[in-house]
Amino acid sequence: EPVQYIVGNVDFYDLNLNVNENVLIPRFETEELVFRVINYIKKNLGENVRILDIGTGSGCIALTLKHKLEHSIVDASDVSLFALEVARSNALKNSLDVNFIESDILKNITSTYDVIVSNPPYISYDEEIMDIVKNNEPHLALYADNNGLYFYREILSNAKKYLNKKNIIAFEIGEKQGSDIKKIALEYFPNSTVKIEKDLYNRDRYVFIFNEINDII
């Protein structure tokens, strides 16, 4: 069993978060995603933004964004009530005001946002992963159909009506998925600027989609 589940909490960015077997253990790649999202928001949108985190799990992304961008309004969704219980406990623990929504992807979302961020399940069912992950962490949060691309297409094909005109969509991705996700993004947002960025191991790990933002900094 992973030590984080035994201890019951984990440090993420500046927060300490509760974790159990209903949520994925937050990875440092996801800390890096949050770091980049914060930078892009501050430089291109300003701090009074509305953010939606899809598939929030422990709440690590949503809570850190709220912590670092205190003027933002942050909503976070998950299909798992057990995950939302953990996320709510983390909001309470860190005194952060995030609105949690039970929703299968975008189904129960009613607002519009400047930023949509997601670290969805992206492992293909036939991909080999480490036993400690496969045997302990929630498969609901790990695996996805369509070679791991299912959630990216679901989000991108439906996102437009939940976005304000000027917006950023940010994803964590599997290292071989960058060009496929870029292709899907341009299918639904043909005028967007799409950036694929690498993690600390020099692997494709993040996709950022910018709409109506001309001079991206």
Task: Locate the predicted segments by residue.
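Conserved SAM/SAH cofactor-binding pocket of Class I
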Residues: E32-D126, M130
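Short loop/edge segments at beta-strand edges and connector loops
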Residues: V7, E102-S103, I173, K198
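Conserved AdoMet
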Residues: E1-Y40
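Generic structural signal for residues in well-ordered beta-strands
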Residues: L17, V98-F100, V194
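Flexible, glycine-/basic-rich loop-and-beta segments that form/coincide
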Residues: I213-I217
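Residues at secondary-structure transition points
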Residues: I25-F28, T56, V74, D78, ...
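Conserved Class I SAM-dependent methyltransferase catalytic core
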Residues: N146-F210
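Mobile active-site "lid"/loop adjacent to the S-adenosyl-L-methionine
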Residues: P120-F151
